[in-house]
């Protein structure tokens, strides 16, 4: 905060009774005295504003979205606004206007003494303004001169709101009824943008069937969590301070649960006897098969659930999923219209001179391969407020914040002023500008964002010339398309970047029908947390529960016969399965040696570097201290089947490996076939032999090999041309001879 007294805040009149009352408490229950009130701090960065809110011009606004959980009610609120503003303003006429859900709650005047510095201001907010979903608006009203010739787009008109600004909410708990109709709340609440942490309560010695059912349920919660990510700590006892999921047969459930008689697959919401005010989601049945049916009913949404408990009938999970048909992935067999990429058509429209980019998320399979080097074609159709003369108005097309192409927007034509128009039908392209863009294939990964950034230059041409008060507008037509259909599915593995970003190759089938998860015979709580959390990530990446995942133990791997891709999770330093595969492993971790500090044997048998084989390379490293590794290799004895192993020197270190998947900066460092995690850092290596999966047509293989040798390709082209010419010459000679004979 800058020195000196902060500027005064002018607050709006106190909200009247007509303001929206807290929807959560009115709809589902009254505030609960069983749980203490809490204070929640929501930095703007956690609400999606990772960069400063840049307000430009005489009148510019930005909004931040914030939710209030269903089981909480706001009792007090304040906005801690951190901002800076131009020192060139006329301060009596310039200010920030703050609103909540469209209602102005305060104006923040600017002070000349604070200009150009960072200022922090606390703004009280009446809690009755808050509902389930809320928009916090900040609008800049700015002037730099008292002259009527002021340019509303002058560069002196600016203010920046820092992403460290906070919305601080005092919240009281709300007692929710035990009602299945509220699911997935309160175990997952879409109003909460934070990391989902949901404990699972499993029997002390859970069998494989129970663990498989728990994994399917975790993948469903992971799909719901999406970008928030989800962690699933495991215990055999009820948590004393949280909600939880309890899963198992009726005979293995914890004591003290208030449940009806179990006469079949049962879903129930009950109070947590160990934590007053908290809830339990109980998934049970008389047998493991009934537990599985209850899970399938819940994750598929095949039944309209209500009341505290419901006994469900057998559910058909449907046909197995086809390759590459994950709901969260784009279709790669046809062009995709932009309307399929947004939930609201208004997301394709912007207004103002320098609006935020139109952002379209594109998640595609990681093994898309462009055999001829061609890019991703986009047919882009857009409209905009045409400038009266050629200026600096542009449309920039970017992929993952990298510029692909920029278009200068053409000025208005003479016929645009005739005053007669026809409203275009959706199928009629008149009135739009169409451009074809080709995104380089090497810039497209499994998770991408396409950014369409309009810059609409000011129309002010002279010192005292007027401009339109209505801001410029631009829109991208929903029938613009992007097309991945000419790519083939082909990838060189192992590549842990594919796994860390999209779960490939396991997520090739959204229901994980070609995946087996291998756990130790006696898994620890950390092993099970890693198992459930990784299946949660699979659901996050695909948007579909892992209905057909198979759970196996080390002794079951041989019986699989190389028919599955394997995800191996073992936090012990001496895994018998990994020891059996030691010849194929790119990395081997030894356990503790001697007394005192842990001695870690880290063996790397380096066989590949920079595309060149090194059959005699190798290293053996010993160090003190724990670590965890992520390793990928081809399943020994199979053809194209993959193994990804999560291992550690001790079970507790698996948590550090799980932390990596929640931090984009660390995920970006996971590459190659070995990723070593220690002390919050990731070191990636490529040390093993590569193998390929997928299919490339014969003509593509010929072209790929030929393209590696351009001189040979040129010589072959010359020879082919000569042979073609000689053949044509011979044919023409025979034709001429026949004519002479006639």
Q: Language model features by range: what are they?
A:
Residues 6-742:
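Solvent-exposed alpha-helical segments and adjacent loops
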Residues 1-3:
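N-terminal Sec signal peptide cleavage junction
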């Amino acid at each position: 905060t800058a020195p000196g007294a902060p500027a005064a805040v002018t607050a709006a009149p106190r909200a009247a009774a007509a303001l929206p009352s807290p929807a959560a408490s009115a709809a589902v229950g009254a505030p609960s005295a069983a749980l203490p009130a809490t204070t929640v701090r929501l930095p703007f960065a956690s609400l999606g504003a990772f960069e400063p809110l840049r307000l430009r011009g005489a009148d510019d606004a930005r909004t931040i979205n914030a939710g209030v959980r269903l089981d909480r009610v706001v009792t007090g609120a304040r906005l801690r606004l951190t901002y800076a503003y131009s020192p060139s303003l006329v301060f009596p006429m310039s200010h920030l206007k703050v609103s909540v859900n469209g209602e102005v709650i305060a104006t923040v005047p600017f002070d000349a003494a604070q200009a150009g510095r960072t200022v922090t201001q606390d703004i009280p907010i009446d809690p009755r303004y808050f509902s389930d979903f809320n928009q916090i608006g900040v609008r800049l009203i700015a002037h730099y001169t008292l002259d009527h010739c002021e340019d509303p787009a002058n560069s002196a008109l600016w203010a920046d709101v820092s992403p460290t600004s906070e919305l601080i909410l005092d919240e009281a708990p709300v007692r929710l009824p035990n009602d299945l109709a509220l699911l997935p709340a309160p175990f997952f609440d879409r109003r909460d943008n934070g990391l989902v942490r949901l404990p699972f309560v499993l029997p002390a010695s859970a069998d494989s069937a129970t663990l498989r059912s728990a994994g399917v349920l975790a993948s469903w919660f992971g799909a719901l969590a999406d970008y928030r990510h989800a962690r699933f700590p495991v215990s055999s006892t009820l948590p004393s301070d949280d909600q939880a999921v309890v899963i198992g047969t009726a005979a293995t459930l914890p004591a003290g649960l208030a449940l009806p008689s179990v006469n079949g697959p049962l879903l129930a919401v009950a109070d947590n006897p160990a934590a007053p005010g908290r809830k339990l989601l109980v998934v049970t049945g008389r047998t493991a098969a009934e537990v599985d049916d209850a899970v399938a009913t819940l994750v598929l949404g095949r039944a309209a659930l209500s009341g505290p408990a419901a006994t469900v009938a057998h559910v058909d999970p449907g046909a197995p999923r086809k390759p590459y048909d994950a709901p969260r992935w784009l279709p790669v067999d046809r062009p995709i219209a932009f309307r399929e990429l947004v939930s609201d058509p208004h997301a394709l429209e912007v207004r103002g001179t320098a609006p935020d980019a139109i952002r379209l998320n594109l998640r595609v399979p990681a093994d898309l391969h462009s055999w001829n080097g061609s890019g991703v074609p986009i047919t882009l159709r857009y409209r905009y407020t045409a400038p009266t003369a050629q200026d600096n108005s542009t449309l920039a097309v970017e992929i993952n914040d990298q510029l692909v192409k920029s278009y200068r927007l053409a000025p208005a034509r003479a016929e645009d002023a005739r005053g007669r128009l026809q409203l275009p039908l959706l199928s009629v392209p008149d009135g739009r500008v169409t451009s074809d863009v080709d995104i380089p294939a090497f810039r497209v990964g499994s998770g991408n964002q396409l950014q369409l950034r309009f810059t609409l230059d000011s129309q002010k041409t002279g010192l005292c010339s007027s401009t339109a008060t209505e801001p410029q507008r631009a829109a991208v037509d929903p029938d613009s398309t992007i097309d991945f259909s000419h790519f083939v599915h082909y990838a060189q593995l192992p590549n842990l970047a594919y796994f860390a970003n999209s779960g490939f190759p396991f997520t090739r089938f959204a229901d994980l029908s070609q995946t087996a998860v291998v756990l130790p015979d006696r898994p620890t709580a950390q092993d099970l947390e890693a198992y459930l959390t990784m299946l949660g990530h699979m659901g996050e990446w695909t948007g579909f529960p892992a209905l057909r995942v198979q759970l196996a133990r080390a002794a079951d791997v041989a019986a699989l016969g190389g028919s599955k891709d394997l995800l191996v999770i073992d936090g012990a330093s001496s895994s018998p399965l990994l020891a059996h595969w030691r010849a194929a492993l790119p990395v081997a971790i030894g356990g503790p040696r001697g007394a005192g500090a842990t001695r870690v044997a880290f063996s790397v048998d380096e066989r590949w570097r920079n595309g060149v084989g090194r059959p005699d390379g190798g290293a053996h490293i010993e160090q003190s201290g724990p670590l965890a590794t992520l390793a990928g290799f081809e399943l020994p004895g199979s053809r194209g089947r993959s193994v990804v192993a999560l291992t550690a020197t001790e079970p507790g270190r698996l948590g550090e490996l799980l932390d990596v998947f929640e931090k984009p900066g660390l995920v970006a460092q996971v590459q190659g076939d070995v990723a070593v995690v220690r002390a919050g850092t990731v070191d990636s290596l490529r040390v093993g032999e590569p193998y390929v999966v997928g299919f490339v047509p014969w003509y593509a293989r010929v072209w790929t090999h030929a393209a590696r040798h351009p001189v040979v390709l040129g010589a072959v082209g010359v020879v082919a041309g000569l042979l073609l010419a000689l053949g044509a010459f011979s044919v023409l000679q025979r034709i001429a001879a026949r004519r002479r004979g006639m």
